[in-house]
């Protein structure tokens, strides 16, 4: 059985984390252990490789960074749990679609612990509660390994989402754990989310 190392990185600037992920992936070998990084970012919009500038509706003081993950624009900020997945997909015998389903499943299983019913959407990857998005997904695959991962809204200021079409969808509502009555702190939720993903990965 393969193991995954979980590292708590605290608050990390987006560019710093992104460069670290690229370096890790470029330097890894077939023997490099897989890692999950838990962190949060200072306020930042990130725009995926297919991102269209018009999805930033109201430019503001929050910086916009064009990144190498898939997808459109989203927001990261304090109170949002980031799970970066640095995995060898060959090791786990996963294709991208299977990995995305496991990412969604990790969030769905976590929320089910709090009696919150959530679901994925094959046409718009992510996790939703009553049509409102609580988790965004993004990935980059390089030489059979992935980076980027899951952004889970725990207890944050959701206002910056109103300045964008989240993930490129006009009028898409967003929600967070706090507004769903989940009182556990973000640190506990982050730990539980990481374990939930590992359970998905190992089919526990």
UniProtKB/Swiss-Prot annotation:
Record site: Lowers pKa of active site Cys: 133
Chief localization: cytoplasm
Top-rank taxon, per record: Bacteria
PROSITE patterns: BPL_LPL_CATALYTIC, LIPB
Catalytic activity: octanoyl-[ACP] + L-lysyl-[protein] = N(6)-octanoyl-L-lysyl-[protein] + holo-[ACP] + H(+)
Subcellular localization(s) per the UniProt record: Cytoplasm
GO molecular function terms attached to this record: lipoyl(octanoyl) transferase activity
Domain BPL/LPL catalytic stretches: 30-204
Keywords: Acyltransferase, Cytoplasm, Transferase
Family affiliation: Belongs to the LipB family.
Note: In the reaction, the free carboxyl group of octanoic acid is attached via an amide linkage to the epsilon-amino group of a specific lysine residue of lipoyl domains of lipoate-dependent enzymes.
Role according to the record: Catalyzes the transfer of endogenously produced octanoic acid from octanoyl-acyl-carrier-protein onto the lipoyl domains of lipoate-dependent enzymes. Lipoyl-ACP can also act as a substrate although octanoyl-ACP is likely to be the physiological substrate.
The protein's name: Octanoyltransferase
């Amino acid at each position: 059985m393969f193991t995954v190392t979980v590292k708590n990185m605290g608050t990390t600037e987006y560019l710093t984390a992104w460069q670290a992920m690229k370096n890790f992936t470029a330097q890894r070998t077939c023997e490099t252990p897989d890692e999950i990084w838990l962190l949060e970012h200072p306020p930042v919009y990130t725009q995926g490789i297919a991102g269209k500038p018009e999805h930033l509706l109201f430019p503001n003081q929050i910086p916009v960074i064009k990144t190498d993950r898939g997808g459109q624009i989203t927001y990261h900020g304090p109170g949002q749990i980031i799970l970066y997945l640095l995995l060898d997909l060959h090791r786990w015998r996963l294709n991208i679609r299977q990995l995305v389903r496991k990412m969604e499943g990790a969030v769905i299983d976590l929320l089910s612990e709090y009696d919150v019913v959530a679901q994925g959407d094959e046409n718009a990857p992510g996790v939703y509660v009553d049509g409102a998005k609580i988790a965004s997904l993004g990935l980059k695959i390089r030489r059979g390994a992935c980076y980027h991962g899951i952004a889970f809204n725990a207890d944050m200021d959701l206002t910056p989402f109103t300045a964008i079409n989240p993930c490129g969808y006009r009028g898409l509502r967003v929600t967070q754990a706090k507004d769903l009555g989940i009182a556990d702190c973000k640190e506990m939720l982050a730990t539980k989310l990481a374990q939930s993903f590992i359970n998905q990965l190992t089919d526990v």
